[in-house]
Amino acid sequence: MEHGNQRTVYVVQVDNNKDLSDAKKYGALRAVFGNPRKPYDTMSMIAKARRVMSEWQNGDHLLMVGDPTLCAVCMVVASEQDDIINVLSWDRNSFSYMPQRWDFGQMGLDYDDFEAADDKPL
């Protein structure tokens, strides 16, 4: 499928109990996973995410709905395509999705500048 300038919102996991209509303003919705059975066949799940997200392009968004493990898989797959990942996060105050821009290209391997959650150097 050639989608040119059409943006896509990759929905990690189908959840028919959620109203995702607000996310449509960021692009056409496309589900990555349905409701797979656990335990997951991890190799096939990664392959499926890569297949579904193979047309990821700069400007697309990832909507983190569903199992956190599958969300992590989709984040990694998206980062294989582009250093910059746009994520939609639900804002309970405005009742809308807010875009977040995650630039993984800015990350270095120098961990001396990082601190742990308890403020102790790593």
Regions found by a protein language model. Name each.
Residues M1-H61, V73-L122:
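Long, low-complexity, Lys/Arg-enriched
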Residues M64:
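Short, surface-exposed polybasic-aromatic patches that bind anionic ligands, especially phosphate groups
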